[in-house]
Amino acid sequence: YIVVENNSVLDETFAGYEAMEKKYGDRFRLVRWDGGFNYSAINNYGIQYAKGEYILLLNNDTEVIEPGSLRRMLAICQRSEVGIVGAKLLYDDNTVQHAGIVMGYQGVAGHAFTGIGDDVYGYFARAVLTQELSAVTAACLLTKRSVFEQVGKLDETFEVAFNDIDYCMKVREAGYQIIYEPHAKLHHYEYKSRGAEDTGKKQERFGGEIMHFIDKWRAQLIKGDPYY
């Protein structure tokens, strides 16, 4: 377990690190990132310390709520044609936050089925079916190390947004499948650690990321999402 510590201040955070170190011993490693927040750079930094055949990106504001979720994801990711597996993420009221990502939705890309109940099947039951999609969120994303090394690290130009979608696009372009596994479920307490995108500076950064993503993947955006 690699935890990247990024300027935390709460005592309970560090108490949690100590508890994990006692529980997992040498399997747990805390590494420090002293720079500003850049989601791509922080994950790339942490991955340098990982030794496994598979890499799981997992946000600090998530909680696994379905037993065996990570095993389900790993079982799928072991297939040779699969490059990435993503999970179903729920808000704390058990409505859907993420059930896959659709290219071109909400402008550039957006989460599918956001706001429906966890027990709602959705259009053609697609909210609850294991399936191939264009992209999944990196809040909980499992990928092969070999694939990560083949397509390259997360693009650090995307400091906060679109880095996961960009990585999925690179993996799909390399010929691998992106799989959404709804039977792997987590709560995602989004924005509780960083805050919402509600300041002028954040909006300016977000706008730049949108333009960079469009410039990079214009042809694919014009063509449309093949899974939607």
Language-model segments: residues:
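Acidic donor-binding segment of Leloir-type glycosyltransferases
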Residues: 1-35
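Active-site acidic Asp-centered loop
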Residues: 6, 58-61, 155
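C-terminal, non-catalytic tails of nucleotide-sugar-dependent glycosyltransferases
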Residues: 20-23, 83, 93-94, 105-133, ...
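Glycine-rich, basic loop-to-helix element that forms the pyrophosphate-binding segment
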Residues: 33-50
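Short aromatic/hydrophobic "clamp" motif used to bind/position activated sugar donors
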Residues: 55
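Conserved donor NDP-sugar-binding/catalytic core segment of glycosyltransferases
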Residues: 62-108
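A short, conserved alpha-helix in the catalytic core of glycosyltransferases
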Residues: 69-73, 127-152, 156-187
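Short glycine/serine/threonine-enriched helix-capping/active-site loop
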Residues: 85-88, 181-182, 189
